[in-house]
Amino acid sequence: ATCRIANSSETFAREQLEAAIRRGARYVDIEIEAPDEHLEYIRTLAREYGCRLIVSFHDFEGTPSLDELKGIARLCRTKGADLVKIVTTARNISDAARTMRLYDLQADGALFEGAAAAERPQLVAFSMGEAGKFTRLLCLKLGAPYTYVSAGASNATASGQYTREEMER
C-alpha cells in the first residue's frame, strides 16, 4: 500500500497507511521525504503488524550520480527500510545503467557498508522513461523481489511502465 503525502495530506496518508497495515497489507511504501514523526509512526505500526516497510525515492527529472544514489539508499536504510526503492528517470542508457549499478554494489556488500548481511534491506531500483523501460525487467534478474506494472495501457502511472499483460508474456 502507498499513499503519498505530496498527493494528499500527511493526515490522510497516515490514515490510509494505518488502515492498510491493520487490514493485513504485506508492504507499505513511504517516501524518503516524509516527516520523521510520520515515518516513525508508520514504521512502528508496520513492525507491530508484521508488515514490511518500503522507504522510497523517486526522481522524476533525471538520474543522480552513483554517489548520490548510494547516499539515498543508505538514508533509506537508516530510516528503517526493509526494502529500499529507488526510481530514477533515465534520459539515456547511461542513466539507466547507473541505476542498475546499485545491484552490483548490493551484491558486493558495498551498498550498505558496515551493515551485517541480516541488516541489509532488499533493493528495488529501476528507471522510468522509455530509455529505462528495460530496467523494469532487468531489476528482477538482478535481485529485486518485484517490479511495478500497470493494469492496462491507460492505467500506467509512469512512462516506460509495462502492462500486466506484457509482463505475463
PLM feature spans:
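Glycine/small-residue-rich loop that forms an oxyanion/phosphate-binding "nest" at active or ligand-binding sites
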Residues: 1-37
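Catalytic alpha/beta core domains of metabolic enzymes, predominantly
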Residues: 33-169
